[in-house]
Each structure stands twice: as structure tokens, then as C-alpha cells.
Amino acid sequence: MINYFFIFLVPSLGMVAGLSVAATVTVFLLISLLQNIAAWIPNRHCEEQSDVAISLNILRLLRQLFCNFLAMTIKTELLFAGWCLISCLFAIKPINSLINFVQVFTILFLGFVVSNFKPFQNRPKLKKALIFGTLTGILLFFVEYFSYGFLTRIFKANFNLYMLDRGCALLSITAWVVIAILIYDKKYCPALILYILVLYLLSISDSLASFLGFSLGGIVFILARFIKPIFSKLIIFGLITGSLLFPIIAGQINPKGLSDKYLTTHPSAAHRLFIWHFVANKIAEKPLMINGFNSSKYTQVKDSEMIDYKGEKWHPLPLHPHNNILQITLELGLIGLALFLSLVYKYLKQIGNIGNDNFRASSYACFINYYIIGMISYNVWQIWWIASSIWVLILMKLLVKPDIVIDK
């Protein structure tokens, strides 16, 4: 019953309160962990037996979890986590970086552990809960959009469309799980209608990153479905090459010229160009330098480096670079970037090994959707955004995958 509640709650509440994902997913992970521990504890038939039996079963569970952890082939993940931890020692504010590190990698650890548990029971009902939760999230968006924030204004003084950006990002990646479920059930028309509905929703939202990510996800789905013999190699080469070239390109662009020509009515997008250009030049000065985990917001900026654009003063690095590649390179250096791209390569290879064509295509689409949003928006280490990725991973592995013969 608890699983139904959370699987419905995360996408629905997440639409109007995106940051809630950090709390709801964390609680969901903890409850799942406790449920699996409780399953190993025998019923208390008699008091003499219970304490010993409980202790033995807990030890067996811990042993199984440890063995599963070792069997997860997470050497690259451990190297990356270790490098992030080392970077905290060289951070501008070491204590803050260490606290952020513990928060991020605690939820990642919980997510990886729970994702290797047994598949969910009563999956048909859980799938319905996810579909209803996603549709409720879509309905809440349109309620807010056409009522100018009726629900939001109950709790806040005013409403702006950008307040739904996080909810739109969550919807864009969760929708791929629902699409995978509908396709597996041979409900192709509802799957297509859902894609078009979400695409339309994102097009009228203020979340350009989610719209681009979901649009490219659709293109990737089609390509992965119809040119499967070479698609795996193409996407790995394209994504890693593009990621490596991005800091170079960002350092060479003329942000003012591009903004004047293409982004006169999109100040937020124009500001992104100035941020990327500034961060890329900072990286070029000392490419091996480690600024520390999640330390972008503490980067010192001179008065002469402030941006003066059309009479407005913009900060060249407000909080974070709004690009996962630039942020990781700035904070962790080229070694950190190499480890991060090794993870990207590993996960794309794992997706490429999925035997079921539709599930593989949905997984590629979801991965690209998440990656593209990270290339345009959000701090790569934001808890709610990390929790969103863990949420989708668990749904794919424990809710969708068990009903499909997928691994070669």
C-alpha cells in the first residue's frame, strides 16, 4: 500500500512542488530498505527463538546486501565518488563541500542498493498508480497554467510559470517509464498520445530544457528502434565527443553577438551563453585545477568580470554553470571529467545490451532526456535532481524490467 502511495505521489506532487522529490524519493527509498529488512525477520512465534532468529536473519541480510554491492561492478562509480571526496579537501569551503558530498552520495548509495532488490510485487497495480500519478501531474500543470497558479497562490503571494520548471523536468523523464509500460502492453496509440500531450505541455511551459530534452528523446527513440545495429556506437561517440568539445566551443563563442542575433527575447538563455563562456575560460586557465565538490557558487569573480548587457548587470557564475560538463570540469578538473564520461560510456553500453527493442529505445530516450536537461539547466548535484534520476532507475529496473526478457 505504501508503494502505491509513493509511486502515485512523486510525479503528481512533484509537478507543483519540484523540490519535494528530494524528500518523497528519499522516504520511498528508506521505506523500501526497511521493508526488505523486515522481510528477513521471522514472525515472533515464541520469545526464546525470536531474538536469536532476528539477529541471524539481519546478519544474513547484511551479508547478502554486501555481496550484492560487490557484485554490482561499480569500480568506476567508486573511483568517481573517491575523486569527489578527495576534491572536498581542496575545496574553497571544504566543510560545505563535504556536507554536500555526504548528502548526494548517501541518496545515490540508497538508490543503487534498492535498485538491486527483488522486483516489486503487484506490478500491474503499481503501474496503474504510476500512470494515474503521471496523468494527475499533467492535469495539475494545466490547472496552474490556465488559472494563473490557483494552487500555488494558496501558499505563495504570486505565481510565475517558471515555478513549474522542476515539475516539468520530472515529468519529462518519468513519462518515458510510462511510455515503456504502455508499449509493453501493446497500447501504442495511448503511448503516442501521451508523448504528444507531454510534448505540447512542455512547449507551452517555461522549461525550454525539458522541451528540448523530451523532443530529442523522441528522436533518439525512433533512431534506436530503426537503426539498432549501429545506433549504440553512434550515440556513445556523439555524446562523449560532444561533451569533450563543449568546453572548447563555449570558450570560443561570442555570447554578446549570439545573444543580439538570436536571443533578444530570451534573456535567460542569453545569460546562459555568458555563463558558459566565462566558466570555459576559467577552466582553460587551469584545466587540472580542483575547485572542490559543488564549489562553483564560491568561485571568486572580479568586478571587471561582471556582465553588462543592455544596461543590465549579470553575474558570470550565479550558483552553478547550468551545464553538467562545465560544472564537473570546473569543480573536479579534467580527471573528474574523464571519470564522469567513463560512467556515461558504461551506462550507454549497458543500455545497448538490452535485448528488447522497445525497452532499449525507451531507456536511451530517458537517458538522453536527463542528460540534455543537465546540459542546459540545474546544478548537477542538486538533491532533487539526483533523486529524480534514482526514481526513474528504480522504476525501470523493479517495475518495468521484470516483465520483459531484456538482457542478452
Swiss-Prot record:
Keyword Secreted belongs to the record: no
Ligase recorded as keyword: no
GO CC term, one of those recorded: membrane
Subcellular location: Membrane
Membrane disposition: Multi-pass membrane protein
Protein family: Belongs to the O-antigen ligase family.
Protein name: Putative polysaccharide ligase RBE_0399
Source species of the chain: Rickettsia bellii (strain RML369-C)
